[in-house]
Structure formats: C-alpha cells, structure tokens
Amino acid sequence: MKNINPTKTKSWNLLKKHFNNMKKVNIKDLFEKDKNRFSSFSICFDDIILIDYSKNIITKETIKKLIQLAKECDLNNAILSMFCGKKINYTENRAVLHTALRNHKNISIEIDGINIIPKIKKVLNKMKNFCSDLIDGNWKGFTGERITHIVNIGIGGSDLGPYMVTEALKFYKNHLNVYFVSNIDGTHITEILKYLSPKNTLFLIASKTFTTQETITNAYSAKDWFLKYAKDKKYLSRHFIALSSNIDEVKKFGINTENIFELWNWVGGRYSLWSCMGLSIALSIGFNNFEKLLRGAYAMDQHFLKQPFEKNIPIILGLISIWYNNFFNFETESILVYDQYMHLFSSYFQQVNMESNGKSIDRNGNLVNYQTGSILWGGYGTNSQHAFYQLMHQGTKIVPCDFIVPIISHNPVSDHHQKLLANFFAQTKALAFGKKSENNHIKLYKYDSNKIKILPFKILPGNRPTNSILIKEINPYNLGSLIAMYEHKIFTQGVVLNINSFDQWGVELGKQLSKKLFSILRKEKILNTSSYDSSTNGLINFYKLWKK
C-alpha cells in the first residue's frame, strides 16, 4: 500500500474548486435538471440490494473527481493487497484477512508462505460438527440433560457483531436460546444467569487473547456460578467452550483443548463474526444458515474486488462520506434501519467505523491535516422519527443518512409493512426536498391570517442528503452481503484518508490506567493530594467515603 496524503493529490485540489461550485447547490434543483437522476445514481447488487444515492449533493462530475482521488490514492492496489494477505496492518505487522474466512472457493491465500485456507476449513468443519451435536441434542450437560441455553461472554468484536447478527436473523432461530454478556458491570451477568440453570447452560468464552479484563472477569463469575451447583471441575468440559488464539490462557482457565475453537491474529476483533467468534450465530440459526451468511459476504467481496469504481457500491459510498466530511464539514452520519430485527445494526457499525477510522495519525506517522472518521450513530424504525428526526429536518447540523429497509417482511401483519415503507419513502423525500414557505402561504392566509406568525416554524429547508438502501429481505445471505458492503466502505475511506483502519491503539491507555486504579480502589486508605490529579483523587476518595 502506498502512503499518500490525499490533500497533496491533484484530485483533492480539483475537488476543492468543485466544492465552491457545489456548496450552494440544492438537491431539488438537481432533480429538476435531470428527470432520470435516479437511474444515473443508483446501483443494484445481485438483484437483492438496491443503492439509491441520487438524493446527495453530487453530480456526475463530483463522482468522477472522487473516483480520480481514489485512483490517485492507489485504492485498487490496496484492495488487492488486503485480499492476497499482505500485512497492511503495519503497526501490528499483520495481514487483514477476514475476507478469507468467507472464501469458499478453496483458492490458496498465503501468509509467510503458508496457505491459511486449510486452517479455516478445519475450524469451520469443527464448528459444523459441534453445532450438529448440540442442536440435535447429542451434546448433553453434566446431568445428561440437553443444552437449551447458550451464553456468549465477550466484548467489542467478540460480542456486538455476533449479537447483532443473532438478533437480525432471529426469524431463523431454532430451539436454542442465545444470550450475550459483555459489560463488566455485575448487573449484566446477574440479570441473565438468574433465569438460567447450570445443568442446561453452555458458555462460549469469546476472547482472542483470553486476557480481556471484562471477558475474563465475567468468565470466572460464570465458572463460579456453574461450580456452585456442579461441584466438580471435571464437568466444565460439558459447559464451557473457548473461542481464542491463546491456548495457554484457555488451559489455565480450565477449558479442555478439544473445547477450543481457534482464531488467528490476522482476524481483527471487529471483523471476526465470520470466524469461530460467530459460533453463537451458527448455534442460533444452524450452521447451514451461517454458511449462507458467509456466502453473501463473499459475493460482496467479489463485487468490491472486481467491479469498476463507477459501479462499485462500497467505493461510491465511502467516497461520498469523504466528500461530506472533508468538504462540507458534515461531522456525523447516521444509519437508520427500518426493520425491528436489525435494531443493533447501527450500533455495530458505530463500533466498526469509529474504531477503524477514528485516527489522527496517518500511515506515515504524521498528524493529519484533514478529517478522518465521521461520528456514526443511528436508530431503527419509526421509533427514531419520534426521537431525533426533528434535528435532522430543522436543526443546524446536517446529518447525511443511510436509510435501510427490507421489501419483504418476515411478519406481514395486516398493512404494517406498507405503512413502514411509506414512512421510509416519506422521510427521505422530506429530508431531500423539504417544505418551503410558498406551499404554506395560501393555506395560512385562507383560514386565519394570524397563523402567519407560525409560518417560519413550519418551513423545512430540505437539502439533507440521504442514501436509500433497499434489501429484498433480511435473510442470512443478504445480511452477509450488507455487512460486507459496509466493511469495504470503511476500508475505502481508510485507504483514501491514508490511515490504518485495522489497529486501535487509542483504547489501550484507558485499559492500562484502569488496572492501576483497580488496585487502589481495593484499599481503604484515602489518597493524598500527590497521588494523582486533583479530579481523579477527589473522585476516588468520594468513592471510598460513600461505599461505606
């Protein structure tokens, strides 16, 4: 990968000039000038996902210049470097190969001269056999009863990705009940375990390093809870599974080697749901459906790898985000999913996006002089309309949005889904085109001239950019494609912005400080003024006074 400061490229300077012509442009005017704008600015993927990006403050010239920027930043070679296993995560000297996890074509991919595909297939086969045994009732708990409850203990990528997918595909779930524990707050694990029985509960301890404080703390609490009932450690083998790359630490915990599903350091945590970290998904919906999830992601991988930039969905979406963040100074973007099953989707990609591209140091080790990752947030369904859409329609902050909705509902109750779709289409139309005073004058004067006073409050300026993403239905294959689409969008942004999207050094300091502070919190002694800064001292001392 080449390390190119995007602001030093010819394309960036051309985009700056182009922005001066575009900053006053209105989306409504763009549609009036081009009656076929939808056709010009929409892409259909495999007849399952439609991306309509026509309601953006862009022209064909904008897209042309953004694509030229991507080419100047050597995006094509960066994509090839990732897929073929080059160590593009240079700060950790690691390859980035979550794409290999869904490569079902048996095409060799090598790291340091070793083909990794056989290792992947071996773990997938082990997952398949385990899922079959447990779902069919052949894997029993220590009392001989069938396992009916699965508790995944992890955090970050070991939790939110599998949790999101399990919720999104709940329509496909079998008889197993899957729960997720992540927070180190004791309330989280307590509220889940209080309804479960040790005799039919299986724990998945999901931690690549098997040293993550939150996960290991919760894992030991789960172990204590289990042994309080089972009494003998020999029974752990029927109730504890490890998803990890640290075999030694897993053994220290007391989990048998045969109960370990292996992970590798070329799989980043936030991209790991495709690996053994997705065992909770496979147990919930069955391994065949998990394979369909992988196949859907693979299809999007091939689109990203092979389609020209002009028709490449992740690239187009990534470049439009850069356009808004760096030229319009729109600091946030939102994902709004009109599907109840998908209620965690925006939270998951908040993590993937902000942990990947929330960087201020470029790949050359220099402080950047431009914007990198956007603040990403979101919501789901019409609930969000009654929460924060007011700001999006009439506030002073412009928030580019992705609206996502399935065409086919799994629960077609009466006319609910048509009303949901009507709201979806209405919101993107209202955000783009608004409601001007001319439309209100006649109505207000006709009935009561005094009401003219409220006229300014009823104006919606419009010109709020959105992408409309229609997905035929939420099924494992389609969801896999959608997730991979966003993964590659984030990668595109990282390459063009010259940052490493696959490390997360910013989270380390807080972890280190918390370990030191934990030992202090266990002591009764009040801190003196020289121990830490006055704020930290004061907070700790109040804790010690009040906990009594």
UniProtKB/Swiss-Prot annotation:
One of its GO terms (cellular component) is cytosol. It is found in: Cytoplasm. One of its GO terms (biological process) is gluconeogenesis. It comes from the Bacteria. InterPro entries: G6P_Isomerase, G6P_Isomerase_C, Phosphoglucose_isomerase_CS, SIS_dom_sf, SIS_PGI_1, SIS_PGI_2. Keywords: Cytoplasm, Gluconeogenesis, Glycolysis, Isomerase. Pathway: Carbohydrate biosynthesis; gluconeogenesis; Carbohydrate degradation; glycolysis; D-glyceraldehyde 3-phosphate and glycerone phosphate from D-glucose: step 2/4. Its main location: cytoplasm. Its EC number is 5.3.1.9. It catalyses: alpha-D-glucose 6-phosphate = beta-D-fructose 6-phosphate. It is an enzyme of class 5 (isomerase). The active site is at E355 (proton donor), H386, K511. GO terms for molecular function: carbohydrate derivative binding; glucose-6-phosphate isomerase activity; monosaccharide binding. Gene3D superfamilies: 1.10.1390.10, Glucose-6-phosphate isomerase like protein, domain 1 (3.40.50.10490). Transmembrane segments: none annotated. It holds the Pfam family PGI. Belongs to the GPI family. Catalyzes the reversible isomerization of glucose-6-phosphate to fructose-6-phosphate. This is Glucose-6-phosphate isomerase. It comes from Wigglesworthia glossinidia brevipalpis. The gene is pgi.
